């Protein structure tokens, strides 16, 4: 997962796919992005947990490096905590019958750095290396986070052929272990493709996969259908629909972002 909470995983994956669809944006540019993600799922339990995730992201894109800082607001309504959702083990029985509780506050802040390791130019091949640190800033008392830092390293490959871009990601994540839990470090990845309809609009599909975080937990498998549209030289919008296929991800979700190039 890209974050301790599943909603963050959606935004991070979608951003990775949409930012590098063809040639990189102009270097030496700052941008600000915000949006909203809503997803819901039972995570193997009997009652749904709803998640609202509102990130604010600042990004600096240089010639070969991209730096990102994401500060999110998080709201969870339901019986599930972050730990149970990560495991894919939603509450059942008496716990699931309890009145849903809404918890909200600061989510986990994420810092990321991406290096363009190879840009093949006319060949259309691009390879990136990304390092991420998820700071445990979300309240573990409220069940909004684990309270621990997580670390991830991933490689990203893009192949542009005409209007079609295919892409894949392979990463490894090291989890911080909260008190009373032993979370496994996991491999994760994604595969997908995007089609450029015109100079302003592209859309596509991506499949996200990940190992289970605990022995009793569930693996991750979800599909995202996304679209991105440039309004002008400074404004860009993005949106997606999610369908989950395992207990380790939401049953479904929707989201949208808007970015402004400074």
What kind of feature is each model-predicted range?
Residues 1-29:
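Cleavable N-terminal export/targeting peptides
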Residues 23-177, 186-240, 245-253, 257-262:
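Transmembrane beta-barrel domains of Gram-negative outer membranes and organellar outer membranes
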């Amino acid at each position: 997962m890209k974050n301790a909470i599943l909603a963050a995983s959606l935004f991070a994956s979608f951003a990775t796919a949409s930012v590098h669809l063809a040639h990189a944006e102009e270097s030496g540019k700052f941008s600000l992005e915000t949006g909203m993600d809503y997803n819901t799922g039972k995570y193997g339990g009997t009652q749904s947990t709803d998640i609202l995730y509102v990130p604010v992201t600042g990004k600096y894109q240089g010639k070969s490096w991209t730096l990102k800082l994401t500060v999110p607001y998080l709201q969870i309504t339901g019986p599930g905590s972050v730990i149970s959702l990560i495991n894919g083990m939603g509450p059942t029985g008496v716990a699931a019958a309890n009145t849903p509780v809404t918890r909200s506050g600061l989510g986990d802040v994420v810092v990321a750095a991406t290096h363009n390791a190879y840009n093949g130019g006319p060949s259309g091949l691009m390879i990136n290396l990304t390092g991420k640190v998820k700071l445990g800033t979300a309240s573990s008392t409220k069940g909004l986070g684990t309270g621990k830092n997580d670390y991830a390293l991933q490689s990203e490959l893009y192949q542009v052929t005409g209007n079609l871009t295919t892409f894949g990601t392979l990463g490894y994540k090291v989890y911080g272990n909260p008190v009373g839990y032993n979370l496994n470090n996991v491999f994760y990845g994604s595969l997908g493709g995007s089609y450029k309809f015109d100079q302003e609009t592209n859309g596509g599909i991506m499949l996200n996969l990940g190992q289970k975080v605990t022995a009793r937990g569930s693996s991750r498998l979800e599909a995202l259908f996304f679209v991105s549209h440039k309004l002008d030289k400074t404004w860009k919008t993005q949106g997606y629909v999610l369908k989950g296929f395992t207990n380790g991800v939401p049953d479904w979700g929707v989201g949208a972002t808007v970015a402004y190039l400074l």
